[in-house]
Amino acid sequence: MSGIKFYLVKGTALFGESHYPEKRKFVKIVRALNEKQAIEYVYSHFGSKNKIKRYNIKIEQISEIKEEEIPDRRIRELAKVDKIIM
């Protein structure tokens, strides 16, 4: 059984499709079991937060990265957490 991996997803998305469409580049670090789940997470995240349709999101590159290569310190620290108690 494979563990959770980190993926660096790069691409472009069309923001504001109805009013003033603007194509923007994005880079997102995603925790997932495989590439397919990482892509699905990106689609669902942009769809729910920014109301962007899946056909307006173009993923150009997806690559697996090591925990040490993550640029954001907060994400690196959260990766070390084994369990969360609420």
Swiss-Prot record:
It holds the Pfam family Ribosomal_L18A. InterPro entries: Ribosomal_eL20, Ribosomal_eL20_dom. The keyword Glycosyltransferase does not apply. Disulfide bonds: none annotated. GO terms for biological process: translation. It comes from the Archaea. GO terms for cellular component: ribonucleoprotein complex; ribosome. One of its GO terms (molecular function) is large ribosomal subunit rRNA binding. Belongs to the eukaryotic ribosomal protein eL20 family. Part of the 50S ribosomal subunit. Binds 23S rRNA. This is Large ribosomal subunit protein eL20. The gene is rpl18a.
